[in-house]
C-alpha cells in the first residue's frame, strides 16, 4: 500500500446538490483529471459511479480516492434525489468539506437548499461551489448572474459569501474530453482547465482537519459489502483513534453488544495492518456472517467505551418554515426519524420542556427546547452528539444529546 499519510494530508470530501445537477459527472471529471496526471485513481468505483449515472439517477453514496501533489482525498458522491436523502445524510455526516454543485441553467433548487442546510447543521463550515452546465448558457453574462444568485442564496443561509470560492464550468464536456483524449494537458482545453482550477481550490481553501488520533477507536458503519469466502466487510470512516489487525472491538447497536477480533483491514481495496482517524476503511470482523451480525448504523469501538441507548434527553432547535422546516406545530407523542451519523431510527418524543424549565405539550417552528426521546431500538450514541430530525420529507430540526437515560 502507498502510505500517503506520512507525506500528504488526508481529506474526506463530498459532492452535494440537487438531483441531475451533475454531481456524479463532476466527481468522475475530478478523478480522471488527476488520473491523467498519474495520480492514484480507484477506477472500479468510477466505473460503478458512471454506470449509475447512465441509469439516470443516483441512489447510493459512492466512495473513491485520488491524490493531488499536496493531498490525498477520499471522495463521497452523494445522491441528490429526495427519495434517497437518508443515504445522503449518512454520507455527508463523515466528511470534512463539500463541493456544492449547482446547475447554471436551473439555479438553486429544493435539494440544493436542503443539502446545504444539512451540511451546515452537521457542522460542515467550509465548502466550494461549482456552477455546472456553463456551456448551456446562451450568453457569458449569464454566468455572472448565476454567481450573484448563488451568493444571495448563500447569504440568506448565514454564510459569508466573500469566503466561499465559486467556480463555473461544464463537468460533462470536461469528462468527455478526458475520455476521448486521455493525455490532454492543462491549457489545451477550456473545460478541463476549469476542473484544474477546482482541484487547486481543494488544496488551498479546505483547511487541514484536526484528527483525534490519541482517543479510543470509534467508527460508525456506513455500509456493508459481502465477499465470497470472506463474509461481510464493514465500511466506514474512522471518527477517532487507531486500530490494528488482531485487536478486539465492540460491535454496538440494534442488539446486545458483542466483542470480537479484527481479522483484516483494507483502505480502498488495499490490505493494511493499521488504520487511523479520518481513514475510509473496510473491516473484516471475526464471527460476523450475515446482515444480522453487522449492518449500517452499528458502531465498532474500543471495548467498553460506548454503549447502546434507548432513551435520551437533548437540546433541540426546530426549524422555521423559511429555513426549510415545518409549517405547523407538533405535539408530545410525535414520532419523527432521528439521524445520528450513519444511523436512522424512529423515536417518540415523550417529554417537552422550555429552556426556562416549564413543561409544554406543543412545539412550534422556531422553538428551542429540551426533549426526551424513546427510540424504537437501541443504538450507539454519546453525550454532546449532534443529530438531525426529519419526517415526511421535511427537515424538522437539529439537536445535541445532553443526557443518556437508559
Swiss-Prot record:
- Signal peptide residues on this chain, from the entry's feature table: none
Organism, by scientific name, is Chaetosphaeridium globosum (Charophycean green alga)
Q: How does it assemble?
A: Monomer.
By sequence similarity, the record places it as follows: Belongs to the TRAFAC class translation factor GTPase superfamily. Classic translation factor GTPase family. EF-Tu/EF-1A subfamily.
**Which molecular-function annotations from GO does this UniProt entry contain?**
GTP binding; GTPase activity; translation elongation factor activity
Q: What is this protein called in UniProt?
A: Elongation factor Tu, chloroplastic
Q: Gene behind this chain?
A: tufA
Ligand binding (Mg(2+)): 24
Record GO cellular component, one term: chloroplast
Where in the cell?
Answer: Plastid, Chloroplast
Q: What does this protein do?
A: GTP hydrolase that promotes the GTP-dependent binding of aminoacyl-tRNA to the A-site of ribosomes during protein biosynthesis.
Q: What class of enzyme is it?
A: hydrolase
Which annotated residues bind GTP? 17-24, 77-81, 132-135
**The keyword GTP-binding is annotated on this UniProt entry:** yes
Please, which domain of life does this record's source organism belong to? Eukaryota
